[in-house]
Amino acid sequence: MTNTRKSHPLIKIVNHSFIDLPAPSNISAWWNFGSLLGVCLGLQILTGLFLAMHYTADTTTAFSSVTHICRDVNYGWLIRYMHANGASMFFIFLYFHIGRGIYYGSYTFMNTWNIGVLLLFAVMATAFMGYVLPWGQMSFWGATVITNLLSAIPYIGPTLVEWIWGGFSVDKATLTRFFAFHFILPFIITAMVMIHLLFLHETGSNNPSGMNSDSDKIPFHPYYTIKDILGILFMMITLMSLVMFTPDLLGDPDNYTPANPLNTPPHIKPEWYFLFAYAILRSIPNKLGGVLALVLSILILMLFPILHSSKQRSMSFRPLSQCLMWMLVANLLILTWIGGQPVEHPFITIGQLASVTYFFIILILMPSTALMENKLLKW
């Protein structure tokens, strides 16, 4: 009699994905972030579901309902802060996961990579709409500023913005639809994650050497299940420390003031995980140019497989490319810092330089350095 795990139509799929999956024997902790992102997504859906039970998507009561969750609902404060800080953890892991993909050349799995970039866009859209829901000052003005960017689209722009708003400004209709989209998108993301995994399992995982590992595979369970559990443990310790001790560390104090269309906050800025893109947007003095740069700063990830000019897949044995990779990381940290600063000298100039450098490293320096490394190795 065959094992149920291997014969049952549904359990068989789980078995091939998480139990008997052949995995490279040398994948490092950088490969933990996929499972951590999965746990984050599950946690966000779960906490979000409980928040939605008590939240009201109406301009007059939204802010009060969030206050009610924190004050009156059993462990409401815990659920709310786990959801808010869980989003921050989600983005930290996303950026590590993408960075890992760039460093080790995982982007050569074209299908997996492209669906991953689409996933990034979907998660960013979800996070943005979630930030609008508490209906604080930064929620309202963030929504106003970001949706207004669409007015830069030639010809259809202004009509498009009013269509998204459901009126002539960000109001009740906007909040209601943002709540609807914020609720449905995580489930669409879950479906996309399944496609992401489907494409990954077609090829098998990459590994730090960037070489074919078919000759040395080990079963996913117990080796990588236990490794993932350790990663999840570290994640939960970090998340719960953040939630219990400094829940508002990554938030904006302005969002504790109810939304007021008649009073603009002195510095409108998004959550920390969007600051690098916001800095790129602000560094261009033209509205349409800024919007294009903003979209391209993420969409540029799609170009990595095309721009790959090295004969080696991974950066493990390419010191010059490694230097550029860490330059890119430093550059993104500078952009994140600039995105949170007011628009004045010297921040404007630093932001413009960092924005140009970002595109220059990816589009010119990385491919040309890879070609130079090929030459140095006489390939």
Curated annotation (Swiss-Prot):
Chief place where the protein resides: mitochondrion
Keyword check for Glycosyltransferase: no
BP GO annotations: mitochondrial electron transport, ubiquinol to cytochrome c
Chain residues that bind a ubiquinone: H201
Domain of life: Eukaryota
Membrane topology according to the record: Multi-pass membrane protein
Subunit structure: The cytochrome bc1 complex contains 11 subunits: 3 respiratory subunits (MT-CYB, CYC1 and UQCRFS1), 2 core proteins (UQCRC1 and UQCRC2) and 6 low-molecular weight proteins (UQCRH/QCR6, UQCRB/QCR7, UQCRQ/QCR8, UQCR10/QCR9, UQCR11/QCR10 and a cleavage product of UQCRFS1). This cytochrome bc1 complex then forms a dimer.
Misc: Heme 1 (or BL or b562) is low-potential and absorbs at about 562 nm, and heme 2 (or BH or b566) is high-potential and absorbs at about 566 nm.
Protein's name in the database: Cytochrome b
Species in which this protein is naturally found: Ctenomys australis
Lineage, highest ranks first: Eukaryota, Metazoa, Chordata, Craniata, Vertebrata
Primary gene name: MT-CYB
